[in-house]
């Protein structure tokens, strides 16, 4: 019966007009990939959208205002793939917000501090080496998610390489600092991978990773299989245990971007992109599970958009100017930009 309900829901939603963005950013020069929203706690209207242009050698990290205009371009970077932000990372005993980028062809992370006024500076010009000792492609970092552990404020980076084996695909590093120099210390490897690709015999990949800091879960997209869920804390007694696999069916394209729309008391949504040419769909799941348990997270909606072949996306529930219930940012491939949607329009499509 549940399967029938889902099929009927998808058929109805497929007939709906696609969501219209409230705004769009200026284009990046080459090849957009992943956005990350930074909230300015002192002045939310001055919040920013960080976004990658993943061109080899001449790529960059682009910083946009909420009206879509460019504030800053950090170039050149050598195929910067994905970006994430975290708040209150301790550097020299002082908290600072950070944006961390995977610089794929340099096999490292780039870490940028975000001042209270939104100014951005490089905290580790030489970068932080990751995936050391791995063969070609397996030593290229693509996906990244940052996790701030609630009990002690420790900050971790969870990194997904370009390729890997069927186990221990993800690498988790604790970020720290010694005598003013940043460090990335490997604390664990974890995560199953189906190796399913777009065609038989071709190995796929894992790129999208997101952490729900408050609830302590990490999700990642095994692109042709499903969305896998684990505990984010490397010290958890069940850290190696897979908790659930979401989205095993109904996707028409790759399972790509992931983001958490977080509300108080664990409410909210896990948002995933179903990557399609000119018609990427938003796949929405309950953040806190169902009456059956926290890891029972059935598909709630498949919402059509006009975004083109979306890789990365991000979302916030913080009210912002023009976005009273929060903001959703989606990569838009052919126009080489990022679309900014009001969450109000998304919520209107939810059951």
Give residue spans per PLM region:
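Short loop/turn segments immediately following beta-strands, especially the blade-tip
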Residues: 40-42, 88-91, 111-122, 150, ...
